[in-house]
Amino acid sequence: RANMAPFLMAACTLVDRTGRHIQGGHYKEAIEPVELPEQTLTYNGKIDRPRLSKKALSKAEIESLARGYGGCTSELRSEVIGAWDFHANITTNIASTYIVDTTSNHLNGFIINLPCRGMTGYNWTADEMVFHHKPEEYGAIHFHDDDIDDARWEVDFTYEVPDLIKSGVYAARLRINGEDSSETEDFVPFVIKPPKGKTTSKLLFVLPSNSYMAYSNDNLGTNSVVAQLLAGKVPVMSASDLYLNEHREYGLSTYSQHSDGSGVAISSRLRPILNMRPKYRHWLSPSLWQLNADLHLTDWLEEKNLDFDVVTDEDLHIEGVDMLNRYGCVLTGSHPEYSSEKMLAAYESYQLNGGRWIYLGSDGFYWVSEYHPDNPNIIEVRKGEAGTRAWTANPGEYNNAFDGKYGGMWRARGRIPSKVCGLTFTAYGFDVSSYYRREPDSKRPECSWIFEGVGDDEVIGDFGLVGGGAAGLELDRYDLEFGTPHNAYLLARSENHTNLMLQVNEEIHFSVRGYYGGGTENPMVRADMIYYKTPNDGALFAPGSLSWCGSLSYNNYNNNVSKILENAIRGFLKEGPLP
């Protein structure tokens, strides 16, 4: 169009001006605000080395331009308006949203909504699998019509937190005409942190916000062909699920596929996340998941008058072990599956420094998930060639654009979860949960204090709000060969799981009939509760189950799951060496 509208690739201009702008954060090269047009006919697929010329070019001229603008004849260069080489600003990463025009016109631009960079180009030879080792073969950007980095909504209200409000998980309640219904009411959750650099409690809860972002607006219940098989029942859809099924413009989760079938690797919290709401019930119903499940823990902490501070994964990534070191005891949520490299380093250092850590989930510290270096509201997850996963990245595209390092499982980078938290992800199944029985180590003098008030032969956790038991959904095991510390005590072990509870596929090398089986046959299908001491009077306690916290409130909070966790926390908060 012969006007002042911007030149778009992978889309067409519908309206020249929208009043929405990009600047700052991951658009740091935008020195002044850049107004965006409203676009249509957005493109799905890769684009590599686009060129714009004043005339139609011959085959030989096109091939010459593809090899590089600088190597063209002066006559051909004079005909070229723009020659964008998407690999031109690859360094050790390609997190930049800036695209470079290599001509003297310098018609540089920006990518909008963070399509995937570091992707194999038209000339990829497969000689290198890492984009920054041979950047000229990684000149493609993969565009999707459902990419989103920021909804760019206007701010409707702000809230200045009064000093008297304690740290915790809160929500802004929004209603239409004061009505309470799923159609007229919404809750927007947020965290109030302690004052920067300070604590208001000896106990810290790290909200696994990375995992919330990874699962944000997931549509497995409506899109996945295995949803019913995973759950052993027909998924129960909420109003939010049905709405998201019709409105894909809110963006997808890293368990989703783009409309062209490729996996979703980038997730942002700068948009409405309808399944991260306190009243949302996951399609795995009657189970809760992520934020909703973690509210079982905060509810229990308040019931037990255990004061606690709350921070997020993002805070841990930014502040590191210095933040953890301010606390006598640190708790995880029920499903801290997604971790950055800095988060793992902080947890490992905290334990070595004498920190006392309680890992309250399963499938923790499993996937590499890195923050955008210029905007921590956005994470990237490349699902590699192994792991229990919803999709697999294409060959040559396993490395993160955001940091240039190998994506996928932390195990594939030599950081198996058991080296961090003593346990490794072993099984998953979403029909019903089970229970634990005590092991001999639980009666040793070093460990018996954790079970004060619990009988020697008492069944532990055969009740609960998540699948009906404390051992369910996803399970972790004690395994010395996989990195569980040799000084770890095996306190309890789950049993009686169904055949829908299956061993994780990264440990299955050959599919052999009758060898692996489900919970009634496979000894690897179990949750192991462990405890061990770390240097400088530190320690770790972990029950090894995702559904554990769902059992805390049973019988008006008077039950053996509640007693065990309360004993562990109060014991960890005491000054001096542990028994």
Which sequence ranges carry the predicted segments?
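Short secondary-structure boundary/capping segments
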Residues: R1, A66-R67, V100-D101, N219-N223, ...
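Extracellular glycan-associated modules
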Residues: R1-R117
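Solvent-exposed loop/turn segments at secondary-structure junctions
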Residues: L14-V15, T91, G197, S209-M213, ...
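Aromatic-Pro/Gly-enriched surface loop or interdomain linker
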Residues: L114-D149, E179-M323, G576-P577
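Helical hinge/lid and interdomain linker segments adjacent to catalytic or ligand-binding clefts
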Residues: D146-D147, T158-E160, L164-K166, N177, ...
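Short, aromatic- and glycine-rich surface loops/edge beta-strands on solvent-exposed regions
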Residues: G168-L174
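Structural motif
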Residues: L204, G328-G333, L540-A542
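Glycine-rich, aromatic-lined ligand/substrate-binding cores of catalytic
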Residues: D374-S562, G571-F572
